[in-house]
Amino acid sequence: MAAVVVAAAGGAGPAVLQVAGLYRGLCAVRSRALGLGLVSPAQLRVFPVRPGSGRPEGGADSSGVGAEAELQANPFYDRYRDKIQLLRRSDPAAFESRLEKRSEFRKQPVGHSRQGDFIKCVEQKTDALGKQSVNRGFTKDKTLSSIFNIEMVKEKTAEEIKQIWQQYFAAKDTVYAVIPAEKFDLIWNRAQSCPTFLCALPRREGYEFFVGQWTGTELHFTALINIQTRGEAAASQLILYHYPELKEEKGIVLMTAEMDSTFLNVAEAQCIANQVQLFYATDRKETYGLVETFNLRPNEFKYMSVIAELEQSGLGAELKCAQNQNKT
């Protein structure tokens, strides 16, 4: 079976090698795999620890001050400072309500999340995705015909179309892919019952979580902290567009993406896109089981399981390494 071809333009060569190795059953970015939950000294990851986490007996803070201080201590707070402050000024009640929800969330055991309400929040947000995406500069109704002449390429073979697709995007700062029809069918069928999932993006400070939500053949991603603080007003920061127009005749599905470059670069968007196939196109029951748990049994879901699976796969390892090198 043909391997999934995923590439990132803009000089992200290592990402191409990383994915090509992964979907041929190889893991070229890590010399040896470790079992889930095992980390060698050379592969230690730094996770941000909430200051003042040792609360006195009796539970949460007596006012919203502690919750707000905790929010500001989030290593990704600066990225969303303006949006959070705008919400605080325009709708103080909504701002306080979200702080209260965060206070309830931090009472839960580490690694667990009682997130039934959060799943509902993500589902409610779906209707607003299109509007918010356009407001952030994304293309409205991005069709395959807006990229190239469909009638013209129908005369070509699947391999020729793949080459045209790759050449077209080679000089563009974006993420793109040519997905075999059977692989896309597996992803698509699973997305119908499990349309939402969580991806972990390596950052210098640890990991940042992004929520993926299918809406038609588009897959929208938004940072988790963005949803927690802005709810339905949270805009998409990455959209993957899938085009099945040639699936039946040519046996391929074309994919490209748009991203908000103020939050993501190409390599980071690539890492998120890779995780779609890691979790939705896998033959490994335990891996897709995380997607099912997130959608069907959210109270049993463990955030750390996503990071463990990402570590096991090797995805994002080179991105993390590059970030650490830039830091030094």
From Swiss-Prot:
Tissue: Weakly expressed in muscle.
Residue range of the transit peptide in the UniProt record, numbered on this chain: 1-57
GO BP terms, alphabetized: mitochondrial proton-transporting ATP synthase complex assembly
Keywords: Membrane, Mitochondrion, Mitochondrion inner membrane, Transit peptide
A molecular-function term among this protein's GO annotations: protein-containing complex stabilizing activity
Subcellular location as annotated: Mitochondrion inner membrane
Bilayer disposition of the protein: Peripheral membrane protein
GO cellular component: mitochondrial inner membrane; mitochondrion
Top-rank taxon: Eukaryota
Coiled coil region boundaries: none
Family per similarity comment: Belongs to the ATP11 family.
Subunit structure: Interacts with ATP5F1B; involved in the assembly of the F1 component of the mitochondrial ATP synthase (ATPase).
Listed name of the protein: ATP synthase mitochondrial F1 complex assembly factor 1
Organism in which the protein naturally occurs: Homo sapiens (Human)
Name of the encoding gene: ATPAF1
